[in-house]
Swiss-Prot record:
GO terms for molecular function: endo-1,4-beta-xylanase activity. Its EC number is 3.2.1.8. The keyword Mitochondrion does not apply. Its main location: cytoplasm. This is Endo-1,4-beta-xylanase. PROSITE patterns: GH10_1 (PS00591), GH10_2 (PS51760). It comes from Geobacillus stearothermophilus. GO terms for biological process: xylan catabolic process. It catalyses: Endohydrolysis of (1->4)-beta-D-xylosidic linkages in xylans. Keywords: Carbohydrate metabolism, Cytoplasm, Glycosidase, Hydrolase, Polysaccharide degradation, Xylan degradation. Induction: By xylan and xylose. SUPFAM superfamilies: (Trans)glycosidases.
Amino acid sequence: MCSSIPSLREVFANDFRIGAAVNPVTLEAQQSLLIRHVNSLTAENHMKFEHLQPEEGRFTFDIAIKSSTSPFSSHGVRGHTLVWHNQTPSWVFQDSQGHFVGRDVLLERMKSHISTVVQRYKGKVYCWDVINEAVADEGSEWLRSSTWRQIIGDDFIQQAFLYAHEADPEALLFYNDYNECFPEKREKIYTLVKSLRDKGIPIHGIGMQAHWSLNRPTLDEIRAAIERYASLGVILHITELDISMFEFDDHRKDLAAPTNEMVERQAERYEQIFSLFKEYRDVIQNVTFWGIADDHTWLDHFPVQGRKNWPLLFDEQHNPKPAFWRVVNI
């Protein structure tokens, strides 16, 4: 079946790269899908700080590097992520007595990590999510409260971009976030990136995570976000796309399979979204799914632990869903 259906990466070859998030299990279990349908890979977790440098000075590149070796040697890699408030080991922020370090020490640790990691993958990783999810979700606060910000100050963001650019001047550098289409947060992200661009900080793009549902955000909200971000003169990547069968506040656990209505609505939704992406292909250069098939999705564990979800284009048996056919036939 896999070789007899259209290839996503070939269908959209003149529009944008097609990518998928992977881990050591899915690189094996979903290998045929990944080889045929995508030309960009993102490590789901294994390029995050806690995996690459669990202890100071001890780097563990062995697992992360698998995505850049045969049979995926022709696939580009999106680096994800260098600085984030989650999945960062406590030693990064503490001294030997368990007390918070000062600004200078933390900046040096940040620089050391970014320089080592970015230089290690130079030439293979074509872009990096340098900063992930630093903007506050709601309220008057502009930036999220985090230990990075608490110790260094608001300029921890610009410093990270400067360090990454120094380590690999050819790599494209991104700010990446979720809820990126809702107006309140959209404007905060816009303001952050504009402030960096105005200072001459090397930031080349915005990553729109695109963890969306059957109804939210609206197409008008998605379009408005794309146009607002594009007005800054930056590249846009769709970095973590999936379409949940459930709204975020829907916590039901009674479905063993999606209803026919859900499947049809998801197909319609994917068709509408990809039609929109194609309309803006001059600024959208990559569309990456957070997975490739429904047998492995983070949404099985969030926001409801242990509830099965079906957010991707291929089902649990790796067969194309109605959404797949709607997308490739746009």
